[in-house]
Amino acid sequence: MAQVNHVENHLESDIHLSLIPSSWGSQVRELHMSDCHDAGLALAHSFATDPLSLYLLGVDGAASWSSEKLWKLHVRLMKYSYASYKLRGVATSIGPDYDAVALWMPPGTTNDDWIATLWSGIWRLWYLLPREGRKRFFDEVFPILHDTKAEIMGNRTDDCYYLGYIGTKASARGRGYATKLLDHMIYKADEDNRAIYLESSHVRNNKFYAKFGFEIKKEIVLTRGPRPIRLYCMVREPQNDKSSTSVADLGTDKE
C-alpha cells in the first residue's frame, strides 16, 4: 500500500530534523543489556579485520568454513562478549548508530568466572567454534590473558580498570570517537587513583594509546597459527593532570 507523507513539503526546508538524539553524535552514553544485539553487531563490524578475531576463528586456514558461516559466528562471539562485560561491567558508546563501543571492567569486578561464562553464552563457543578455534580460544588465549594480567598488575590485578574492547566502525573512523570513549573512563580512573590495563592487538594502535599515557609492559605471542599474533599489554598509571587529550581516532582494537 502506498503511503503519502502529507507533511513532506512542510519539512523539506529543514533537512536537519531527525528522530536520532543529536547528543549521540558528540556525547558518550552508557549502554544497557538491552543494547546487546546492536552493540554486539557494531563490535563485529569494528573487529572484522582485527588480527586476534581472525586468529580465533581460524581464517588463517585452520577452519574450512564459508565466510558467511564465520561471520555469523563472529557476530555471536561479540554479542556474548558484550553480555559478559555488561553483566558486571560498563559498556559505553558514541555515534548515532553505535559507531564506537567500549567494554570495561571497573575495579572490584570480573567476568572471568563460570557465572559470567554461563550467563553470557560464552560457554556455547565450546560447541560453536571450529576445533582449532576452540583450542585457541579456551586453551591458549583465555589462560594467557588471565595469567599475564596477574603477572603485570600483581596485587592490583582486581583493583584496576580493564579495557576489554574498544572498536570503531570503519565508516566512522577519524571522528575522534575512540578518544572520547577513552577520555570518559580515564577521567574516572584518575579520580579513583586507579591504573588502567589493556591488551592492544595491533601495533599501529600502540602510539594512539601512548598519547593517553599507556606504556607497553609485555608482549604476548600466540603461536598456534601459521604466523605469530602479538598482543601488547599496556598500563596507564593514574595521573593528576586532568588536561584533556585530543588525538586522532586510529581505528579499532582489542584490549
Which residues fall in each region the model found?
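Helix-loop element at the rim of GNAT/NAT acetyltransferase active sites that forms part
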Residues: L41-E68
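C-terminal "cap" of GNAT-fold acetyltransferases
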Residues: L198-V203, L222-E255
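Conserved active-site alpha-helix within GNAT-family acetyltransferase domains
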Residues: T179, E191-N193, H202-E219
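A short helix-loop-beta-strand connector motif used in the catalytic cores of GNAT acetyltransferases and
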Residues: S66-S93, A100, D158, Y162
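Conserved acetyl-CoA-binding loop-helix of GNAT-fold acetyltransferases
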Residues: T168, G174-Y187
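Conserved GNAT acetyl-CoA-binding A-motif
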Residues: D159-Y161, K188-S201
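Conserved acyl-donor/pantetheine-binding loop and adjacent beta-alpha core of acyl/acetyltransferases
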Residues: V101-K169, R173, T223-R227, T245-V247
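A short beta-loop-alpha structural element at the N-terminal edge
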Residues: Q27-L41, T49-L52
